[in-house]
From Swiss-Prot:
Entry annotated with the keyword Signal: yes
Paired cysteines (S-S): none
Secretion signal span: 1-21
CC annotations in GO: endoplasmic reticulum membrane
GO biological process terms, semicolon-separated: cell redox homeostasis
Protein name: Selenoprotein T2
Molecular function per GO: thioredoxin-disulfide reductase (NADPH) activity
Gene: selenot2
Family: Belongs to the SelWTH family. Selenoprotein T subfamily.
Covalent link location (Cysteinyl-selenocysteine (Cys-Sec)): 62-65
Record key words, sorted: Redox-active center, Selenocysteine, Signal
Lineage: superkingdom: Eukaryota
Source organism (scientific name): Danio rerio
UniProt keyword Signal, yes or no: yes
């Protein structure tokens, strides 16, 4: 029974460590890929802009808030009603300080779980008294790893979440959740698009070509 419990503890702790390392690695790898492919993407977009002169509808939204699904649903509906509109979507970047705090928590989570798994006491290394909570965590490794994992993830989400759902048409803002406080329903968005497209057509008619 003791052997089974020890094996289960080691397996659970190893799982937490692997998931945490994967979380950090995947996040870093995606950022690196975006940076490496950035010039190519920008070149492709510039080439598309040289051939495409129609309206461009751009969404910037909070991915961690679950707005990716909303963007996909709205994109399908808008494409059916306005097939000439090109739709783009991207994550709304958090503030730099929040981004750095989120990255710090990712590494802190990994370090905390690694110390719990190996049984190391960082307080003794610095000549400090061991807090009771750390001694309790060593006696309850699975539960303490759970707490470190989920609390760190909760704080990461808090710092990286912007709550944004911003919409621009030809680089002109037509909706901002950060200002209005809510995401428009699809009918509201249709009405907004219709009004702006009519205004753009009227402006083109008022300026005759030379």
């Amino acid at each position: 029974m003791a052997e089974y419990s020890q094996t289960g503890i080691l397996t659970a702790l190893l799982l937490f460590t692997v998931v945490t390392v994967k979380d950090i690695y995947v996040g870093r790898n995606s950022v690196t890929q975006q940076e490496n492919t950035g010039p190519d993407i920008n070149t492709q977009r510039q080439n598309k802009h040289t051939f495409y002169t129609g309206p461009v509808l751009k969404f910037q939204y909070c991915i961690s808030u679950g707005y990716s699904k909303v963007f996909q649903e709205y994109s399908r509906s808008i494409s059916q009603l306005y097939p000439d509109i090109r739709i783009e979507g991207d994550n709304y970047p958090p503030k730099p300080i929040n981004k750095y705090l989120g990255n710090f928590l990712s590494y802190f989570k990994l370090l905390a779980i690694a110390l719990i798994v190996t049984g190391q006491n960082p307080f003794q290394m610095f000549g400090m008294n061991t807090p009771r909570i750390w001694a309790w965590g060593q006696e309850n490794k699975i539960f303490s790893c759970l707490m470190a994992f989920f609390i760190s993830n909760m704080l990461e989400t808090h710092f990286l979440s912007t709550g944004a759902f911003e919409i621009t048409l030809n680089d002109i803002p037509i909706w901002s959740k950060l200002q209005s406080g809510y995401v428009p329903n699809i009918q509201e968005l249709f009405q907004i698009l219709d009004n702006h497209l009519k205004m753009n057509q009227a402006d083109k008619m008022n300026f005759p070509s030379p």
